[in-house]
Regions:
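Substrate-recognition element of Asp-dependent hydrolases with the DxDx(T/V) motif
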Residues: 82-101, 106-134
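Juxtamembrane/interface motifs at transmembrane-helix termini
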Residues: 36-38, 64, 105-108
């Protein structure tokens, strides 16, 4: 039997929290646009935009922000105020600035594995966003 020499990790929500920040931001987005559409419908429209845009923007915060802006324009009939677009950009900036907090035991586990294995990060996320987390 061959000895395992390399271990790959999917980082987001495996090594550190990630999805919870997207969900919290989505709640704030829904509140920003509450006057235009029911929260559940707005969430569904945002999800449609995210899926439609994956091939164009990929995974990550920047693609999420662009999908939120696109959704805001769509649900407002093009009348979304510039200040609301600014608020959406602010939500994205907050996500990008949020400190990375590893999940319990991750640091110790990686340090131990690094002594005997090559460790690699496997991600579908935005390169710049993922690199800032390392």
């Amino acid at each position: 039997m061959k000895h395992l020499t390399t271990i790959g990790f999917d980082a987001d929500d495996t090594l550190w929290q990630n999805e919870q920040f997207f969900r919290m931001t989505e709640e704030r987005f829904r509140a920003l646009l509450a006057g235009h559409m029911d929260a559940d419908q707005l969430g569904a429209r945002l999800l449609e935009a995210e899926k439609r845009n994956l091939g164009r923007y990929g995974f990550g915060i920047k693609g999420f922000m662009l999908s939120m802006i696109e959704t805001a324009i769509e649900v407002s009939g093009g009348d979304v105020p510039a200040s609301t677009i600014g608020d959406i950009l602010g939500l994205g900036r907050e996500m990008l600035a949020h400190p990375v907090e590893t999940l319990p035991g991750v640091r110790e586990t990686l340090e131990e594995l690094a002594d005997s294995h090559r460790l690699v990060l496997i991600t579908k996320g935005d390169l710049f966003d993922q690199e800032r987390k390392l």
